[in-house]
Regions:
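Short terminal alpha-helical segments
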Residues: 4-52
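Positively charged, lysine/arginine-rich intrinsically disordered segments
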Residues: 1-6, 133
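N-terminal non-cleavable signal-anchor helices
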Residues: 9, 16, 33, 69-70, ...
Length: 133
């Protein structure tokens, strides 16, 4: 019985340490998962918008406009502000706004993951470099 009570503090300490490590890992990974989710959500929106553009549409249907507005209001304040400033029925304007928002999230994701992004590469491959596009 004495041995069980002696190991309990060590066990509790180990559980606390593991819980703390898991919480710290979650703080690191949750923003990355959220960024990936936001990119995927905007991919879906962009697919729908592109299908309409390819079909020759110029006016954004109400149901898709509602999807874009709902996403923006819940997950992207900057996109929501831009949607309010543009003609929300203009398919091309909404497509461009969502595309720009997705690019911004990609930059945020690169920063979270601590990897280079296309802006970093543009600075690295300055005009005059043999590898510059």
């Amino acid at each position: 019985m004495t041995m069980a009570t002696q190991t309990a503090p060590h066990y509790e300490s180990a559980v606390r340490e593991m819980s703390q490590a898991a919480a710290e890992a979650e703080q690191t990974h949750a923003p990355i998962r959220l960024a990936y989710w936001r990119i995927a959500a905007m991919d879906t929106l962009l697919d729908r918008l592109e299908e309409l553009r390819l079909a020759g549409e110029r006016t954004l249907p109400e149901d898709i406009r509602e999807l874009v507005v709902a996403y923006a209001e819940r997950h992207d304040r900057e996109l929501a502000d831009r949607i309010q400033r543009i003609d929300a029925e203009d398919l091309n304007a909404v497509h461009d706004a969502v595309f720009d928002a997705q690019g911004r999230v990609m930059l945020e994701l690169a920063e979270l993951r601590r990897v280079p992004n296309w802006q970093d590469l543009d600075l690295t491959l300055a005009p005059g470099d043999d590898e510059a596009a």
